[in-house]
């Protein structure tokens, strides 16, 4: 048999591994065309084994990064080489791909994006046919093929690439149609920070259709500037614009628009914890929140947890990552979950975080309440002072084995003993960046400041050196 020989993806590299949000890294270094092509082929071969209808299409979308065209095309080449029909929808939010895979009988989907990361990074997220991220067992099977460096077999039943940008409008319609007749945002002035990324594709259109007066920032696709000093990780431009425009609220999206943060009319941050609190209150009042339970993460603020418990609610903490939140939601039968960073999951709407849907729901909730977002924020909870610092650790093995660092473990124990139940420490390796994240939360700002600096110095001295 003729074979198409492919360079091993392991040549000169660490083994390829799925992280908390797919495969992510520097485009052209970790994420090469060869890797994307091989990944496409082996994703196809593995997914083929999971269905009795292997001719179902595979859907690919992308954000605005300069490397996204290259990676999307290479991934599509691998999938067509494996015999699949590929529908490339172009620029879209990640939740658009999740929605389309779940509603078009696709065998799977992929989003080319590195979410909130800088423009030079990129990533590939793989979705199963139900719109959820690929399960760990299938990820491991794909990893094994990639890291074996096998040649890609020649097939005679090639697939074809189809450009289907019109499918993005199906997603847009699904978000706006249930509310469009009611026009719930009529008269609402809102600022949208689209981060030069995927949110550009549909977000302003949906807000306009629901009656809002829209002021858009960073509102075209720009691969050089995606997430640069804008979006959900850099709120200053949004805060300033909301105050200057005297807007009721503002929303900032990340590069692939699967998460969102808000600011109120005073420019104060309304993060994922606040959104969960408001949404949880609403579902609780409608008797639609089983066991009054919300799934959050280890990053969620103690102030939120204690305020929710004071309402008679339960809060379960998952590991960081929306797939872990989703798993805990399924385990506990929860309707609502999310992350402080703005990934919000409500099982009324699907299985993944959706920045646009979350923003529309929050804006509608505020309008229906008769109060302003600022008033709702004031009535919610007082967050504990919380500090999050990232320490760059280039050595991957040191990052993954940070728990074996005895000086750091001793310092963590000392900090926790000092704060008792009035604070907490969280140290973890990022699943998306080469950093160790250090978070300290305490009732008093000076205590949080002290232990954060002490722990950052310890990580720097023993892991980053």
Curated annotation (Swiss-Prot):
GO term, biological process aspect, one: UDP-N-acetylglucosamine biosynthetic process
Matches recorded under SUPFAM superfamilies: Phosphoglucomutase, C-terminal domain (SSF55957), Phosphoglucomutase, first 3 domains (SSF53738)
Cofactor(s) required, per the database record: Mg(2+)
Cofactor notes: Binds 1 Mg(2+) ion per subunit.
Keywords, alphabetical: Isomerase, Magnesium, Metal-binding, Phosphoprotein
Root EC class: isomerase
Matches recorded under Pfam families: PGM_PMM_I, PGM_PMM_II, PGM_PMM_III, PGM_PMM_IV
Keyword Magnesium: yes
GO molecular function: magnesium ion binding; phosphoglucosamine mutase activity; phosphomannomutase activity
Keyword Membrane: no
Residues given in the record as Mg(2+) binding sites: 115, 254, 256, 258
Active site, UniProt feature: 115 (phosphoserine intermediate)
Modification Phosphoserine, positions: 115
One GO cellular component, as annotated: cytosol
Post-translational changes noted in the entry: Activated by phosphorylation.
EC number per UniProt: 5.4.2.10
Catalytic activity: alpha-D-glucosamine 1-phosphate = D-glucosamine 6-phosphate
Entry's family note: Belongs to the phosphohexose mutase family.
Described purpose of this protein according to its UniProt entry: Catalyzes the conversion of glucosamine-6-phosphate to glucosamine-1-phosphate.
UniProt name for this protein: Phosphoglucosamine mutase
Protein's gene: glmM
